[in-house]
From Swiss-Prot:
Recorded family membership: Belongs to the NADH dehydrogenase family.
InterPro entries, alphabetized: FAD/NAD-bd_sf, FAD/NAD-binding_dom, NADH-Q_oxidoreductase
GO MF annotation: an example: oxidoreductase activity
GN (gene name): yutJ
Lineage, opening ranks: Bacteria, Bacillati, Bacillota, Bacilli, Bacillales
Superkingdom of origin: Bacteria
Keyword tags: FAD, Flavoprotein, Oxidoreductase
Cofactor note: Binds 1 FAD per subunit.
E.C. number: 1.6.-.-
Protein name: NADH dehydrogenase-like protein YutJ
Cofactor: FAD
Length: 355
């Protein structure tokens, strides 16, 4: 019996599971899924958990059940790609015939002194819970500094504003205009929403140091009762420690078939993979679809195509609290209630089809 090991239960490997189970898995292949949590977490909603507008229950999805699916739990310390083993701190290694690395990402602090020690995070469900506890326990008129005004920072700031209108919220953005990679009309809409809802945006920010209760912007100190870091990501440490070829962002360079060069048994999906698009749940799922096709061909002894089709991504949706949002769908900017409703609908569909 061949063993396919899925290293991490994120969006990419969940899509692999749902494509292979219940009836697309060859009779001579079993699957082992490894994760630290006994459920799949909706990472795209961690901002709402941290802001206190949803509970754990709303962002947990059970792993599927199947006679040839074995779910194992533990904290992975390393992957031995020569011996084809996944190593743990407190349990025996797990061997694989084929494996898909889907360990996701962590915060990237850009060598800013004090940032790892004195900021909160929304990168894992445990970190998001810790951030919620801190934000929820703040007294009225306390100040929250959110460093980084990408999608995560924007959604956290807006959700927190809706949850705690008594807080002073500062959002640090390194660009001239918030969400500057989006069309200007959309960026101005988001900037105006924050202005109307009393969220202070500091554009052209450059965080040079963080101390307990203090953010230094261009070396100027700004006091805050809580500091949340949403200013960049990097691959999981297990991936960073792998001695394989990586791109400038530390993501693993792959063949057109999504496996490591020279190792057709080890694949990488999602945030750890070097791909032509920014990391996202949507991209991880699109890549997973192709990996499943490649695995099935290899298991069946069929020839592989020289290249795989380009990914067709539908767009991006973001929320501004529960009633407003923004998005870019088929290169068309959307603002207001419609993108928020679309995002809520997609979340419901995901939970309905995967739960």
């Amino acid at each position: 019996m061949k063993k396919l090991v899925l290293i991490g239960g994120g969006y990419g490997n969940m899509r692999v599971l749902h494509r292979l189970l219940p009836n697309q898995l060859p009779d001579d292949v079993s699957i082992t899924l490894i994760d630290r949590n006994p459920y799949h977490c909706l990472k795209t909603e961690y901002y709402a958990l941290a802001a206190g507008t949803i509970s754990d229950h709303h962002i947990r999805v059970s792993f599927p059940e199947h006679p040839r699916l074995d779910v194992q739990y533990g904290d992975i310390t390393s992957i031995d790609i020569v011996q084809k083993q996944v190593l743990f701190q407190d349990r025996e290694p797990i061997s694989y015939d084929d494996a898909i690395i889907g360990l996701g990402c962590e915060d990237k602090y850009h060598n800013v002194p004090g940032a790892p020690e004195f900021t909160y995070s929304i990168q894992t469900i445990d970190q998001s819970r810790e951030t919620y506890q801190k934000l929820n326990n703040l007294s009225a008129n306390a100040t929250v500094a959110i460093v980084g005004a990408g999608l995560s920072g924007v959604e956290l700031a807006s959700e927190l504003r809706e949850s705690r209108d008594d807080l002073n919220i500062i959002l640090f953005d390194r660009g001239n205009l918030i969400l500057s990679s989006f069309p200007e009309r959309l960026s101005k809409y988001v900037q105006k929403w924050f202005e109307e809802h009393g969220v202070r945006i500091i554009n052209r920010a450059n965080i040079t140091k963080v101390e307990e209760g203090v953010v230094y912007n261009h070396d100027d100190p700004i006091s805050a009762d809580a500091i949340v870091w949403t200013a960049g990501i990097q691959p999981n440490k297990v991936v960073r420690d792998l001695d394989v070829e990586k791109d400038a962002q530390g993501r693993i360079v792959l063949t057109p078939h999504h496996n490591l060069p020279g190792d057709e048994h080890l694949y990488v999906v999602g945030d750890c993979a070097s791909l032509p698009h920014a990391p996202s749940a949507q991209l991880a799922e699109a890549q997973a679809e192709q990996i499943v096709q490649i695995l099935q061909k290899r298991w069946n002894g069929e020839a592989l195509p020289e290249s795989m089709p380009q990914f067709k991504l539908k767009g991006v949706l973001g929320s501004l609290g529960k009633k407003a949002g923004f998005g870019l769908v088929a290169d068309r900017p959307l603002i207001g209630r419609v993108p928020r409703m679309l995002k809520s609908g997609l979340l419901w569909m995901y939970k309905h089809h995967n739960g």
